[in-house]
Amino acid sequence: GEGVALGLVDVAVMEDFVASQNRHGLAVEIVDARRIRELHPHVTDRVIASTYSARDSQVNPMLLMKGFFLGATAKGLTFLRRSRPESLSPRNGRWEIKLSTGETLETGSVVNAAGAWANEICGLLGLEFPIAPRKGQVLVTEQLPPLGATNVWSAQYIVSKLRPAGVPAPGAAPWMSGPEEARKAADFGLGFAFTGTHSGNYLIGSTRENAGFDKTTVPEALGLLARQVIHYFPVMKDVHFIRTFAGLRPSTPDGMPVIGEVPGFPGFFMAAGHEGDGIALSPITGRVTADLVEGRKPEFSLESFRPERFLEGQGDLDEAASG
């Protein structure tokens, strides 16, 4: 994939991003305008640099989820449809879960991997984690021939994705009409992502909005997305959009997921808050969470993801757990 830069500020963002990726052993580099146009002949001449990784790839999340489901059921998973936990109680070193279907389950461990709804599960224990839904609106195009060799993101999309809550958004992009449109784009958390699919449709996004559980799409935001993609890829001016949709990402204030056993609640584990990286990080999250549940030391440090960082000031956790 590529993260494209339109100006020197964007290049600085990309340089920091690439340096971080390289420190972790990932094969990512910055390429010049000539190489960009070899990969993407339709991109605007305003793009001056880009990140590039030949190892970047994408998956269909629905097929991935189906694969996880089939693999897990083959190993003994029981999947309960149309049921939700209504109470969650520690009982003599185990957990009792009462479901909306009237069924009661007993287990030694509970893993809260409920995504944007994870805090609702925590609420059953009197806990509160700042895991909140962050809406993303997306345009879907008609089927097209391939427009380039990779998926494309803007430097500002990376900033929007990684920027912790409360940090000012980037300024006006060159395609915006002025400060008012820049303000609206900042309110929507606008970033640029241009992703092809195996069927030939392109997904164009996206916003990052703190809008609760509202998944409606907004014409004003969609219009900004359309204008933005035409700026990066002028060939898109005559392309038809066939539908729109919005989804929810489970976000945290510091941009890090919450992974680990909750202090004071033995056997209750968090694995949520990955925002838009949940699909990419699902295999490793499953592995380290399984290690924790089984009492093994994970291969990787989970220090940055500790649940404790969000629990200060929430009273006596041991008393809450025993209650």
Segments and roles (model prediction):
Residues 37, 85-87, 244-249:
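Short, solvent-exposed loop/turn elements at beta->coil junctions and helix N-caps
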Residues 1-39, 192:
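Dinucleotide-binding Rossmann-like beta1-alpha1 core, especially the glycine-rich loop
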Residues 30, 35, 77, 95, ...:
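C-terminal lid/capping helical subdomain adjacent to the catalytic/cofactor pocket in oxidative enzymes
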Residues 32-33, 81-83, 243:
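Short loop/edge segments at beta-strand edges and connector loops
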